[in-house]
Amino acid sequence: MRIKMLPFALVVITIAFCGAAYSQSLGEQTKQYENGGFYKGTFKNGRQHGYGTYSLPNGYEYSGEWVNGQAVGEGIAKFSNGSIYEGAFINGKPNGFGKIKYADGGKYTGSWVDAQIDGQGVAEYPNGTRYTGGFSANKYHGKGTLVLNNGYSYEGDWVNGIKEGQGTINYADGAMYTGQFVADSRNGDGSLTTADGIVLIGVWKKGELIGKGTVKQPNGDIYNGEIKNGRQEGTGEVVYSNGDVYIGQFSNGFRQGSGELIGADGYHYIGNWFEGQISGSGTETYPDGSVYQGEFLANLADGKGKITYANGATYVGNWKAGTVDGKGTSTYLNGMTYTGNFENGKIHGFGVMTFGNSYRYEGNWKDG
């Protein structure tokens, strides 16, 4: 965020006087000059010296100390635009400590060098913005803190009015970034904590987290891997707060492509994902040792697949929303085999049940 600087440059107050002869007196005198200016004050050797006031037809006025015809020491300068400077002068220019108040309500208090803001100081803007820190040639420079009235603040390094180096931003929405800056943007190593508690750590470029990084969720989930536009993109690993681990591909922040999920309870899946859900082909191993291999949709067996139960029984055939549904073959522990239709997990419709060579039934079934 760039802040428009106050118009800090001042008119140099060195006065070029005209005329041939000047009084040698140290007493107070009044002089008028060819440029229309008036000086009322003390002189020495024909030059303004001591204390006096110099004014111009355009409304400019300086009152303060003089040495050999120049404003040197403490004084007050009033400008035609309504701005007022009060402080130290050297050779007719603000030098040292001084403060200026602008007609629009803006203020600066601090160090000056040759009529420019330079060194440590405080700038206050009409809109409530406040900067405290270093300046060089009227620009923020060095260490400084900028605070806006909407809650935004930056504390850190500045180079010629631009955030450059190490710093911390507190955003108006509650987010916070700590890290490196280049050309007013997050650039380099840094950490961003969003308003909802998500933490993004890694290398930034032009304000965006790119390449490999870390994303920490408020619930304790931690992602390490490739990132694009602040989201998981590419290959990475998530360690979930419950102990589960996912290793694989991501797209736009979702598990997508091929990946492996290792559950803390012994569950295991390896296969395809889409928008964060198990979808496509894969193999699922359950904590009890059962294994399903086949097609999935929205985290459930859907399409063609085979399950081998922990006790050795099997089913090969169609599935719908995680349930045996359609044509398939079940092999039971007692040696029986059924081939035919299923509905909602039960034998339903036409099918054939056999038990070795001793039993065979071929016909219709209803609800198992």
How would you label these PLM feature ranges?
Residues C18-S23, G27:
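Boundary at the C-terminal end of the N-terminal hydrophobic targeting segment
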